[in-house]
């Protein structure tokens, strides 16, 4: 299947089949894929928590508003975090990069614009990994739903990943055959190519 065909097939699943579970091998493959995610200057300011423990997953589901039902039906929830401490990020992540990348890009174009800009830039890197992850899921024949509608404060408390703040989560599983959001039932709604693509 071509990547274009995968893109046409992929959608934010709303109703999962609770009888179909992701295998341990698939979960391990997804872990490896996420470690290979791209980021600006290879900064990697992230952590990914793979939640398969039913009790923990249930606690997180209760803090996920309209996404609670989806989380309870799948056996994998992945939480994407960003590093909180800028100084720790610079010491741990940037110190191992080529000096030219740091002095030629990070310091004059990111850090020079203030701490809020650094924080926003770090979060942007985590979102890059999300697109990569969703594409990988589609390639593996898995259905996934990215979710920003979660209680970030409670997610942080439940997961206890010191030094990292949760940004969003993704359910991964298999869609129910009758999922109302499936493109076969609800055609994809996207702007026309000419509205979003410029060719110069």
Listing of model-derived features with the role each one plays in the protein:
Residues 68-71, 77-80, 161-181:
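A glycine-rich helix N-cap at a beta->alpha junction
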Residues 49-124:
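Glycine/small-residue-rich phosphate/adenosyl-binding loop
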Residues 38-42:
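Glycine-rich phosphate/pyrophosphate-binding beta-alpha loops
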Residues 5-7, 11-15, 167-200:
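C-terminal helix-cap and adjacent tail motif
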Residues 43-46, 142, 167:
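Short secondary-structure junction motifs
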Residues 22, 55, 150-151:
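Short beta->alpha linker loops
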Residues 1-20, 26, 33:
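N-terminal targeting/leader regions
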Residues 34-36, 78, 100-101, 106-158, ...:
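Small-aliphatic-rich amphipathic alpha-helix that forms the alpha element of a beta-alpha
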């Amino acid at each position: 299947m071509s990547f274009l065909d995968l893109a046409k097939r992929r959608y934010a699943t709303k109703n999962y089949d609770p009888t179909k579970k992701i295998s341990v091998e698939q979960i391990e493959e997804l872990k490896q894929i996420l470690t290979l995610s791209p980021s600006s200057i290879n900064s990697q300011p992230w952590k990914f928590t793979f939640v398969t423990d039913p009790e923990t997953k249930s606690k997180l589901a209760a803090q996920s508003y309209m996404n609670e039902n989806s989380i309870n039906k799948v056996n994998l929830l992945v939480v994407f975090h960003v590093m909180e401490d800028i100084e720790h990020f610079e010491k741990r992540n940037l110190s191992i990069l080529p000096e030219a990348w740091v002095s030629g890009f990070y310091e004059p174009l990111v850090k020079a614009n203030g701490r809020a800009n650094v924080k926003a830039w770090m979060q942007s890197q985590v979102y890059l990994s999300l697109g990569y992850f969703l594409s990988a899921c589609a390639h593996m024949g898995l259905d996934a739903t990215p979710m920003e509608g979660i209680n970030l404060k409670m997610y942080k408390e439940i997961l206890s990943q010191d030094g990292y703040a949760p940004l969003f989560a993704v359910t991964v599983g298999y869609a129910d055959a009758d999922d109302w959001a499936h493109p076969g039932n609800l055609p994809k709604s996207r702007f026309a190519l000419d509205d979003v693509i410029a060719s110069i």
